[in-house]
Amino acid sequence: MKSFVLLFCLAQLWGCHSIPLDPVAGYKEPACDDPDTEQAALAAVDYINKHLPRGYKHTLNQIDSVKVWPRRPTGEVYDIEIDTLETTCHVLDPTPLANCSVRQQTQHAVEGDCDIHVLKQDGQFSVLFTKCDSSPDSAEDVRKLCPDCPLLAPLNDSRVVHAVEVALATFNAESNGSYLQLVEISRAQFVPLPVSVSVEFAVAATDCIAKEVVDPTKCNLLAEKQYGFCKGSVIQKALGGEDVRVTCTLFQTQPVIPQPQPDGAEAEAPSAVPDAAGPTPSAAGPPVASVVVGPSVVAVPLPLHRAHYDLRHTFSGVASVESSSGEAFHVGKTPIVGQPSIPGGPVRLCPGRIRYFKI
């Protein structure tokens, strides 16, 4: 009798920790902070950063919801909604994401929202589908925290373009190294005091010596491309003229190593990197972004008047979620159902914890 009671108690305990499959909806809903859910979300963030062609890396801030669908004959697919925050690391910067600082609210933070399908098979996570968008915090919210903090400025504004050109020219004139070409204008702000334009931009090294350049059009990118990142400010002097301050950091070249993909997952396309030899961002001709569509990359024109790189220009949700083998997986309209009324079943815990701050 004691053995029967013990067995019954163990069965009840197991039921408390297992995640039941909803027999009506066909999926299960684990907690948003469940370890497997978090691993799937982190795999998605890693995928996003590897495929961003410009702008800054994003980091996971919160998991909003999750559904786990069975995939036949093997594996399961996590249908996840996540919030991300922009970091201060450019996408060309090889610094590990864990070492990148989140851009603070007083610096005009940018938040991303993503719907992602992640395949878990044989203990490995692979992204099947990604749809994202991102937007800066509202001016009102920034002003509440910091009335004098500068806001993001349009990247094609003539004052921004001028500040980048002057800052890069100043750096090249004082450099003993390679002549640097502009890759993209990444971020800009109009600072009220002192009156100035603050800019951040990506660059690439060429085969020319900076101080010896006469005709920049004859300079070519290095065979093994090397990128860098610059921060500058152009301050308006009270009696006229400009005070230019700029610092640039060149990154070590990073070899691209193809990663093996589990059966049924799309092969990752190589990260699309802006071509520094192409036209620089300006008011006359905006650059183009790239959309990840399975193993291919499709060019998409960027909006002319923008202050940041919107994730939707790369992750527009056009990729298929069908696997190349096994039964196809489709996320469509699901029945509206309540929580499974299973005695001793777990309480759903979503959305998950906020890792930084909410905007």
From Swiss-Prot:
GO function terms (MF aspect): cysteine-type endopeptidase inhibitor activity; endopeptidase inhibitor activity
GO CC field: extracellular matrix; extracellular membrane-bounded organelle; extracellular region; extracellular space; plasma membrane; vesicle
Residue ranges, annotated region (Disordered): 257-285
One Pfam family recorded for the sequence: Cystatin
Matches recorded under SUPFAM superfamilies: Cystatin/monellin
Gene (UniProt): AHSG
PROSITE patterns in UniProt: CYSTATIN_FETUIN_A, FETUIN_1, FETUIN_2
Residues with glycosylation annotation: 99, 156, 176, 271, 280, 282, 296, 334, 341
Domain Cystatin fetuin-A-type per the UniProt entry, residue ranges: 27-133, 144-256
Native source species: Bos taurus
Key words, A-Z: Disulfide bond, Glycoprotein, Mineral balance, Phosphoprotein, Repeat, Secreted, Signal
Principal subcellular localisation of the protein: secreted
Protein name per Swiss-Prot or TrEMBL: Alpha-2-HS-glycoprotein
